[in-house]
Amino acid sequence: MEERYRMIHYLCYCCAIFFALICLLLATRLSAQAQTREAYVAQSEDETTLTFYYDALRATRTGTTWGIEETKKEGDIPVPAWAETWDVADYTTTARVVFDASFRDFRPTTTAKWFYCCEALKQIEGLEYLNTSEVKDMSYMFYDCKALTSLDLKNFNTKNVTDMNSMFAKCGALKSLDLMNFNTQNVTDMSSMFDDCWALTSLDLKNFNTQNVTDMRKMFSDCRTLTSLDLKNFNTQNVTDMSNMFFSCGRLTSLDLQHFNTQNVTNMDGMFFSCEALTSLDLQHFNTQNVTNMEGMFSYCKALTSLDLKNFNTQNVTDMSWMFFDCWTLTSLDLKNFNTENVTNMSLMFSGCSALTSLDLKNFDTQYVTDMREMFSYCAALTTINCNTTWWCPESENMFAGCTQLKGAVAYDKNKVDAEMANPETGYFTAQPTMGESR
C-alpha cells in the first residue's frame, strides 16, 4: 500500500514538472513572439491595398512591406515610405487601406502624411484598430485623398495632438466630417486644415477648443460649397496668422466674427478673398494693431455693399495692395481713420470698385509708398478723390485707367492715366487739407 502511495506521489510530481515545463515553453515562445512584434505596412501584390499590422509575421507577407517609421523624400520633405508623392514614377493606385486587428496594440506618436497623396483611396477599414492616444502630429494625414467621400473618425483620440496642419487638405470629394469627438485642446497649428475641401457643405466645430492655436492661415480656404460656419466658440487669442483663412469660401453669406480676438494677429493677407456671397461683415471688434499685411483682404467680395472699418488700427500695416479689389457693390468707404504712414504698397487697392462714387483719402500718408499701380483703375463711377496737400506718388502705371467719371483740377483724359495725374493742381485729385495743414 505504501508503495502504491509512493508511486502516485511520484506520478503527480512528474505531471507537475511536465506542466511547468510546458508553461515555461509557452511563456518563452509568447515572450519571444512579443519581442519580435513590429508595426509595418504591407502592400498587396496588385498595389491597390495597404494593410497595417503589428505582429511578428512580416517575413511571411507577400508584396512589398515597410516599417512604420521608414521614410522617403518628397523633394526635401520626408514622407512615409508607403505614401504616394507628386513624382509620376512613384505614383501608385492605393484604393483601399486596412488596419488589421493586431494593430490595436501599437501606439504611434505620429500619423503625419500616412495617406499623403493617395489620390485613388476610396475606402479605409478598421480605423477602430488605430489607437491615436499618443499621437502628437496628424499633419497632412489625409492630404490629397481626393477620392475619399467619407471618414469615420469617431474613435480618434486627439487629446495629445498639437499639429493638424493640412490634415484634410485637398479632400475634394469629402461631403461631410463628424469631428464632434475631436479634442483639440493642445493643437497649435490648424493651418490649411480643411483647405480645398470643395464638397463640404457644413462643418460642426462647436466643440473645437482653439485656445492654443497660433496658426489658422488657409484653414477654410477653397471650401467653395460651405454655406455657413459657426465659429462663435473659437478662442483666437493666441492666433498670429489668419491669412487666406476664408479664401474663396464663395457660398458663405454671413460670418459672425464678433467674438474673434485678433490682438496678436500680424497677417490678414487675403483673409476674405473671393467670399463672393458675403453681404455684410461686422469687424468692429477686430483689433488690428499688430497687423502688417492686409493685401487682398477683401478682394472679390462682390456682394459687400458696405464695410465699417472705423476701428481698424493700421499703424503697422505695410501692404494694402489689392485690399478692396473688385468689390463691385461697395458704394462707400470711410477710411478717415486709416493710418498709412508705414504702407509701401497700394497697388490695385481700389481697382474694380465700380460702385464707389467718392473717396476721402485726405488722411492718407503716402511718404513711403513705392507702388500705386492701378490703384483706382476701373472705378467707373468714381467722380471725386479727396487728398491732402502732401500726397506723394511714385511712378505708377495705369493708376486711373477706366476712371471715366473722375474729375479734379481737370477732367478725365483716357490718354493720361499714370501717376503724374495724382495731384490736385493739374490732375484728378481734389485738395482737401487736413486739420493740421489748414492751421
Which stretches of residues belong to each language-model region?
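N-terminal secretory signal peptides that target proteins for export/translocation
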Residues: 1-10
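Conserved short loop/turn motifs at secondary-structure junctions
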Residues: 9, 22, 29-33, 387-389
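Intrinsic-disorder-associated, low-complexity terminal segments enriched in Asp/Asn/His/Tyr and depleted
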Residues: 10-13, 244
